[in-house]
Amino acid sequence: MAANSRKAAAILLSGGLDSMVTAAIAQEQGYAVHALTIDYGQRHKVELQSARLIAAKIGAERHVEIEADLRALGGSALTDDIDVPKCGVGNDIPVTYVPARNLVFLSLTTAFAEASGARDIFIGVNALDYSGYPDCRPEFIESFAVTANLATKAGVEESAPFKIHAPLQHMTKADIARECARLGLESAWSWSCYDPLPGLKPCGACDSCRLRRKGFAEAGLADGLDYPADAPPIQGENA
């Protein structure tokens, strides 16, 4: 199917594994991918390079990058001078939580979608193997869909309202790793680490690295990223 004959979908593409798989799922479902990447002042800016690579590799119809610098607000290890924790995934909301990030990002993606003529929005949030961020939960996604249709011209005047797709929401990281392989994606195209080492290597120890490594290990698949030899062990990894 030619790209110009496919229905457009706005994809929030961070450059991470989840957003890459989400974009490919949208494409598999017949959508033309209009990807939006947001530079929010994150310390792991390497993910922006990954987003560009992913958009090129999957043949996105359009890829737009915008700045929404959240560093001035502070309050997160990803945008402030706060150490990224390396002690494992806990039960509390960690300091890597960026205040209202997905609320901000989905608002921007909705604006991008409306301007692009897209009414389907895809986001790669996950509520199983994740760090406990409140803006990844199903009830947030459901409530935002209502808000998007109340707050936009498209939602008020058109018969086809915005629909928010979160295809990974109820998948484990192992499921997502398997989807990556099934869709023919290279895991090394994506980036997950919050605290990159010199030479742009993943640390292997932050929450995001641990969850990703755990997922590939449980799926029995090799991850294409090069983790340091002294990274904390993950059961089943390299088995």
Swiss-Prot record:
Biological process terms in GO annotation: queuosine biosynthetic process
Keyword Ribosomal protein attributed: no
An example molecular function term from Gene Ontology annotations: ligase activity, forming carbon-nitrogen bonds
Enzyme class (EC, first level): ligase
Membrane spanning stretches: none
Family, per entry: Belongs to the QueC family.
Protein name: 7-cyano-7-deazaguanine synthase
